[in-house]
């Protein structure tokens, strides 16, 4: 939504372009169609430049500061689009927060849910078999939408924190550069002042000699 965060926004835009261009290069008979859902003012301005033969942009009121209700509504719309067969895949491009000094560009497949995303890692045989009540399908129908929503919330929150961290780093860098420039100017001023005083002293000495 805002600037003054270094290359944060531009890196997200470049990653989005990379995904679209890679899909275009891999096209066979049927071209891949893209629908971009920008979140934030900066992203919306960028997305409008992508509109073309196989790229469409869907405007939404979503921002990085949207409430939990707005995120749930937005995620529900994407899920319904997927279930209706209007889209084959939903991916989220965001910046994953690692630390205050490290943020990583990430692309996460939201739908369809990859089996690897649901894997727990280590397999423990003693915990098998599981009993599901009332049944597996009912539980999946209840849990999976919550999983998709939590994944979207995590991506938006992580991106928001990364944006603030990038802004702090950018402002700190700008502050350090300003101090360095000020020191250089102060040094140059002192040199010029010293030269001026020396020149005046030489003029005075020269005048007395005359």
Where are these regions (language model features)?
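C-terminal beta-strand-loop-alpha-helix "lid" module of Rossmann-like NAD(P)-dependent dehydrogenases
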Residues: 2-210
């Amino acid at each position: 939504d805002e600037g003054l965060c270094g290359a944060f926004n531009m890196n997200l835009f470049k990653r989005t372009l990379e995904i679209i261009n890679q899909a275009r290069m891999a096209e066979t008979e049927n071209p891949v169609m893209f629908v971009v859902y920008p979140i934030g003012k900066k992203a919306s301005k960028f997305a409008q430049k992508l509109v073309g033969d196989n790229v469409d942009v869907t405007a939404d009121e979503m921002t990085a500061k949207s409430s939990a209700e707005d995120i749930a509504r937005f995620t529900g719309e994407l899920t319904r689009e997927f279930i209706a067969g209007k889209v084959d895949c939903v991916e989220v491009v965001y910046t994953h927060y690692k630390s205050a000094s490290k943020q990583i560009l990430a692309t996460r497949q939201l739908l369809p849910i990859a089996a690897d995303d649901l894997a727990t890692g280590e397999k423990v045989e003693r915990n098998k078999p599981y009993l599901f009540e009332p049944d597996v399908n009912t539980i999946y129908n209840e849990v999976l939408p919550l999983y998709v929503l939590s994944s979207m919330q995590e991506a938006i929150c992580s991106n928001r924190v990364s944006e603030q961290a990038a802004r702090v780093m950018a402002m700190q860098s700008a502050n350090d550069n300003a101090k360095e420039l000020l020191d250089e100017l102060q040094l140059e001023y002192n040199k010029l002042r010293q030269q001026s005083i020396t020149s005046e002293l030489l003029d005075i000495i020269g005048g007395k000699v005359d």
